[in-house]
A protein has these predicted regions:
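An extracytoplasmic/periplasmic, membrane-proximal ligand-sensing/linker region
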Residues: 30-32, 174, 241, 263-324
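N-terminal (or domain-start) structured segment
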Residues: 25-114, 153, 177-206, 213, ...
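C-terminal lobe and pocket-closing loops
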Residues: 124, 210-278, 307-310
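Hinge/capping helix and adjacent helix->loop/strand transition within the periplasmic-binding protein
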Residues: 83-89, 103-190, 239, 252-285
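A ligand-binding cleft/hinge motif common to bilobed small-molecule-binding domains
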Residues: 97-107, 171-175, 202-236, 313
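Beta->alpha turn/N-cap motifs
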Residues: 93-98, 158, 188, 205-210, ...
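Short coil/turn segments
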Residues: 40-42, 96-97, 132-137, 158-163, ...
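Bacterial N-terminal signal peptides
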Residues: 9-20
Length: 324
């Protein structure tokens, strides 16, 4: 097999960086790495984790697999990683808001901050307010008016308790005094199935999950949680345009491992993933999916995790998320 000149340079640079690391970090990885995902296959976390796994595997010449361990809104996978050996071979790809909300709602057996070693942000998600293609609502205002008239209010589907989609939708409905009932699914794909068939009135899926259904008319977009309008949906307004800037939620997704991972190992893993994020195919796929690549230092990510935990403890009370 012939290596490209660019890849040779990347491998050489990575090799030189290893010389300054302690032995455990220098030897990493010597066997396959597992990326744990707490939601069902086909959702934004799963899809993007698999894209990263492919890019990382190509960069380091070692197998990287994705394992879906669903349950408790991602809590089962998070608890599994928290209890894993801090050797870098079992890592978690997760939503910052959901990771904090599940324990804030009393539905988890892990420590959202102290139980994990932050590595780096991976990507941001953009979510879009969608209704079935045959819904009478063509704007957010019309949807909310329907909810006020409908017995029991709107039915709201989410990809999981504490997901950005869940928090965003609930905050907007409460701010606009719209009655609603929430159904939580184990990921974006099962939620989308019920949204398309009209079993739920609306949801806030990610662009990557919903774009094909928007294109063929099975779903209709009413609003977008993004800094600016998205080119493929030029007529869909942003939340800022609609007057809901204060209801926006954090939408970062990140990579973490068990607490106790040596700093040099954390640094090595971070460098591997940042180098992999420069893969042209990965960049192309994430751009198409409306999930821009982002990165951070472990310290920056740690502060963000703490901020999310502080925020979600308050939101759990405001949104009545606390479970027995």
């Amino acid at each position: 097999m012939t290596l490209t000149f660019t890849r040779c340079l990347a491998l050489a640079a990575l090799g030189l960086s290893l010389l300054a690391l302690p032995a455990p970090a220098q030897d990493f990885p010597s066997r396959p790495i597992t990326l744990m995902v707490g939601l069902a296959a086909g959702g934004i976390t799963d899809v993007t984790a698999r894209l990263y796994a492919e890019a990382v595997s190509k960069a380091i010449g070692q197998r990287v697999t994705v394992e879906n361990k669903t349950g408790a809104g991602g809590g089962v996978a998070a608890a599994h990683v928290q209890n894993a050996a801090p050797d870098g071979y079992t890592l978690l790809v997760f939503s910052g808001s959901q990771h904090a909300t599940v324990p804030a709602a009393g539905n988890a057996t892990y420590e959202p901050v102290k139980g994990f070693a932050p590595v780096t942000f991976l990507f941001n998600s953009v979510v879009v307010l969608t209704v079935p293609g045959d819904s009478p609502a063509r704007t957010m205002k019309e949807l909310h008016e329907l909810g006020r008239k409908k017995q029991g209010g709107l039915t709201f589907g989410t990809p999981g308790l504490g997901s950005p989609s869940h928090l965003l939708g609930a905050k907007i409905l409460l701010a606009d005094t719209v009655p609603f009932e929430t159904t939580h699914y184990r990921g974006g794909q099962p939620m989308m199935a019920d949204l398309i068939t009209g079993r739920v009135d609306f949801s806030w899926p990610t662009l990557s999950t919903s774009r094909s259904f928007l294109a063929d008319g099975k779903l209709r977009a009413l609003a977008l949680d993004a800094d600016a309008r998205w080119a493929p949906l030029p007529d869909v307004p942003t939340l800022v345009e609609l007057g809901f800037a204060n209801q926006r939620v954090a939408s970062w997704f990140a990579l973490g491992g068990p607490a106790g991972m040596p700093p040099a190992l954390v640094s090595k893993i971070r460098e591997i993933f940042i180098q992999a994020s420069k893969d042209p195919e990965l960049q192309k796929r994430l751009s198409e999916n409306g999930t821009p690549i982002v990165s951070s230092t472990p310290e920056e990510m740690g502060r963000a995790m703490q901020q999310e935990w502080d925020t979600m403890q308050v939101l759990a009370k405001t949104l009545n998320l606390r479970q027995p």
